[in-house]
Amino acid sequence: MKRISKLATSLPFLALSIAILLSGCGTIHRVNSDYDTTIGKKWKTTNVHQDDELKGQLSRVAVLPMFKGEYDHMDLSLIEENIRLELAKLGLFEVISVDPEAMKELFAEERFSSIGVLPAQLIEKLHARYALDGLLFLDLSYFKAYQPVGIGIRAKLLNSDSGKLVWAADEIFDSSNPEVSNAARKFYKRESIIAFPLQNTKSVLHSPGRFSKYVGNSLFSAINLQKS
């Protein structure tokens, strides 16, 4: 009977403790959300070429494996995947990921640069396999894994029917640039603070993986499909 009595008296205290803990988590989340702010200009991707042919022409776009150039010795699969996922999340096209194994099977090479020599039947073979109407090349032009992290991407989108370049962007996202860090933190606050409520938005500037999500979003948000 004494054990039951002790348990009964401890239950209100336990309930109160849980309530305090839960309210504390809510407070931390609110503090991060309300007060973890950025001041100043936010970077926007502006080094962009877009042809009018892009609007309303492409619905199924294949993304080729990212050409890593001098960074080919690094495993950047997470960064590559994050950039592709950010394109898919924008809902601009149906995004088809072409894996390196498929490229090697078709062309004996896993990756091609958008500014290099391409196989003569690249578009034809990929169109036959994936029924695509657009082809996106990605080149990693700059990468810095340590603070301040940085990622440079050159992207080129071709109309697979005409072979014409319909969109291109070439940007270096350097987190030491205040405008870039502000934009990255704002993106992280909007997209990730619910999943990681205890983390300050500055953590996006310390992780190439998290930073790459911002890079993909900023880069592909520059695609304008609105008809004038």
Predicted segments with their positions:
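N-terminal post-signal-peptidase region of extra-cytosolic proteins
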Residues: 42-49, 119-123, 137-140
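N-terminal segment of the mature soluble domain
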Residues: 58-65, 70-135, 218-225
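Solvent-exposed loop/turn segments connecting transmembrane beta-strands
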Residues: 70-74, 142-149
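Bacterial N-terminal signal peptides
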Residues: 12-23
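C-terminal/domain-edge helix-coil "capping" segments
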Residues: 25-57, 129, 148-150, 160-228
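Beta-strand elements of well-folded, non-transmembrane domains
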Residues: 142-144, 157-161
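Bacterial N-terminal signal peptides that target proteins for export
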Residues: 2-14
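Soluble periplasmic/extracytoplasmic beta-strand elements of cell-envelope proteins
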Residues: 60-65, 135-139, 152-156, 168
